[in-house]
């Protein structure tokens, strides 16, 4: 039986980032063979990672990347905020979103799934890729990305289209695009425009509001008017274009788009947005 020295264990730890006990166990099982021990660690790690999948992973962070052809956001969860700051965790997320954006993929390849399991084994937490959003940047489009705070617990991507693409160099447009991303981070709209809201959802809300007014004693026509007003207000809360702009709530986002379009002499359109949040 091979004698496993502390120096051997230290060397394996430095090469794999695995724990002392796991390294010692792997070396013993491999008879002191370093390459075999690494394989044993991977096998042990994947098994233990799968056992951790039922543990809550309510922390994490959002990662982003853009290469002017595609852009994307990635939400990776973990169990503790301490791990969300771990350099191995951060490096994994940054590398993964770059690979996904550069390939245009919105799902993990087998090799990437294995990397995820190995990371979970090394850090010893339930780590999961929760959400992937990749978008293609078409002609006359550009994106603005905002990550909130040191731990990037909120990530926003806004894609805009400009009739005159040379205007994307305009500071007013760039500032407005960033303000839009900040707006989405602050108010978390669900839809871009009212037309995107499911008609069945609107009907359900109308029924709820009408039910609330059943005992009001008001006439049917007045109730209909009140319900219509409540629906309009509700849609303004969940639709980006109808929300009061975060830096000037006297104007809606739609009206701000028109104002900036006039100022730079080029029509601006919000093509889409994405909001990701930990928790």
Swiss-Prot record:
One of its GO terms (molecular function) is translation elongation factor activity. Keywords: Cytoplasm, Elongation factor, Protein biosynthesis. One of its GO terms (cellular component) is cytoplasm. CDD domains: UBA_EF-Ts. The keyword Protein biosynthesis applies. Associates with the EF-Tu.GDP complex and induces the exchange of GDP to GTP. It remains bound to the aminoacyl-tRNA.EF-Tu.GTP complex up to the GTP hydrolysis stage on the ribosome. Belongs to the EF-Ts family. This is Elongation factor Ts. It comes from Borreliella afzelii (strain PKo) (Borrelia afzelii). The lineage of its organism: Bacteria, Pseudomonadati, Spirochaetota, Spirochaetia, Spirochaetales. The gene is tsf.
